[in-house]
């Protein structure tokens, strides 16, 4: 144990709840479950957790510490490492600030900053005058986020703030495709996240009106899981692609990724290995009527946790270690992208961590892509094959979603 580690004791009246929420492998009495089969909080929050058989004596109850940010005349830097930081960035952008993020780690004044660190400079925000630091400190203080003052654009180690490894970005205009052909729960998750957590403006557009949409009115278009009929129209699809090539950014989630794969975008659904051995036993196809509800389970994955290997040098994975635990709700994985594609999140053989996976799917869920980015002209398409915002519960996926909206493509 290290100073500052949190101890959750099982010696308490809610010990059964502690066990249910923290045990790494959920125990299912019956695999015929109607909902997700794994929900361990350390995976959902992206935390390192350890179980101990012996009772651990800990100190006083943890008390939140209050951050006090000091004044600066040149600029601030803040770490990019969670949803609270993303909320601060969203609010600063709405106030008209131009921000920068670091593509590479750097060190300044004894502090180490990882990829994605947010840089706020006076030279980029002259129009705000003396209000710049008042606005910045007020928003950071309200969210208890530490700001690190800097006195120049030079750093002790790494790339200086004026280098090509530091990218500026402004507030993007974001649209969410909705309507009867879009999964209402999937769209609702995104809408709720923007409205209740980021407090960032979002324009809702009916996907059936795609032929009449002026895509150039927006910087980012979010496609939740759904059936996008306009992708079956070559003219409408080409208009959509043309907007992307001119600098538009798309964030596609779940089934929307499969829709784009079918519309000849740069991602392809991975098929089962042709070389897999098939059962040649004639009697293997025989089944009992009693098991009619259970047989389909061999090809199902009702919300299981898989470990995804991340390329955290790409902006989509900034703020993460070299891995991410995803909640897998379907059997879709994609081929590794080539040429203009970046394979940011991939799964390898033996990636299962917790939950139920049908016996016929275990060999399929390997050597494939789940999270990636396709460069298309001056724009990008971000593919998130799994639901990173699942029911506002999968906390560790929220930063990746913010990366896709604010950082990727800038």
Q: Predicted segments — roles?
A:
Residues 1-410:
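Intrinsic-disorder/low-complexity accessory segments
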